A protein has these predicted regions:
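N-terminal accessory targeting/assembly segments
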Residues: 1-112
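Conserved beta-strand/loop subsegment of P-loop NTPase cores
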Residues: 97-104, 125-136, 155-163
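Flexible beta-alpha connector loops of hexameric P-loop NTPases
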Residues: 107-108, 137, 213-217
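Histidine-anchored nucleotide/phosphate-binding helix
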Residues: 113-128
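Walker B catalytic acidic pair
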Residues: 135, 188, 211
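Canonical P-loop GTPase G-domain recognition
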Residues: 138-192
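Walker A/P-loop
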Residues: 195-196, 200
Length: 217
């Protein structure tokens, strides 16, 4: 059956896969395209303003003309306070993920207090945390062992992996997390290797992976 992409279809379930200020990349059963917010839809529900990963209901009007009506309930989400509201309401920055890869580099970025705070954020988000200690190829075996043990003592009950995006050390242990029906979000400081990991993993499998914008804690 051929779908007429120009025909209007109301209340179609779609997912946000990209955000460009007031434009959103969406994907649904009818295809992919751009969508805008229905005027006035989020005036009284700013916290539910669409973000990447959200499931939404749209009026499909073609690849680049669809209208977002409402955001469906989230199973998990990260949020940060919106500066324009003087801290009165929070803005979601990623939604509907299954696991949170908390990334810290095994060098100057390694910080147990920050790791503890990220773990709290991950559990509160509704996702399951996994700690990735990156750039394992840049430290000695002794330093790696010491920091791995320290992280495991902080992240009780959480899987902790040491990986290298250069040598692919630890990548085999990531395979259990790479399932097409699951979504992963990456959380960590700038420079720890988030974008590199995304590029490496998406060459090996098809799976939604999101990078959370900076959350200051």
């Amino acid at each position: 059956m051929t779908i007429n992409k120009g025909t209007k279809h109301h209340d179609i379930k779609a997912r946000i896969i990209g955000v460009h200020q007031d434009l959103f990349d969406i994907t649904c059963s009818l295809g992919t395209g751009l969508a805008r917010i229905k005027q006035g839809s989020y005036r009284d529900s700013a916290a539910m303003y669409p973000t990447i990963g959200d499931q939404v209901l749209v009026n499909w009007q073609g690849p680049d003309q669809s209208i977002i009506n409402t955001t469906l309930p989230r199973q998990s989400y990260f949020k940060r306070l919106d500066g324009a509201s003087c801290g009165h309401w929070a803005q979601a920055v990623a939604a509907n993920f299954d696991e949170v890869f908390i990334m810290q580099a095994l060098g100057a970025d390694f910080n147990l207090r920050r790791l503890e705070r990220y773990l709290t954020l991950a559990w509160e988000s509704g996702g399951v945390p996994v700690v990735l200690l990156t750039k394992a190829d840049l430290v000695s075996s002794a330093e790696l062992a010491t920091k791995l043990t320290a992280a495991q003592e902080i992240a009780i009950g959480v899987e902790v992996l040491a990986i290298s995006n250069q040598s692919h050390q630890g990548y085999s242990a990531l395979q259990a997390h790479l399932q097409p029906v699951r979504t992963i979000v990456l959380l960590g400081s700038s420079g720890v290797g988030k974008s590199t990991l995304v590029n490496q993993l998406q060459q090996k499998c098809w799976q939604p992976i999101m990078i959370v914008p900076v959350i200051r804690i």
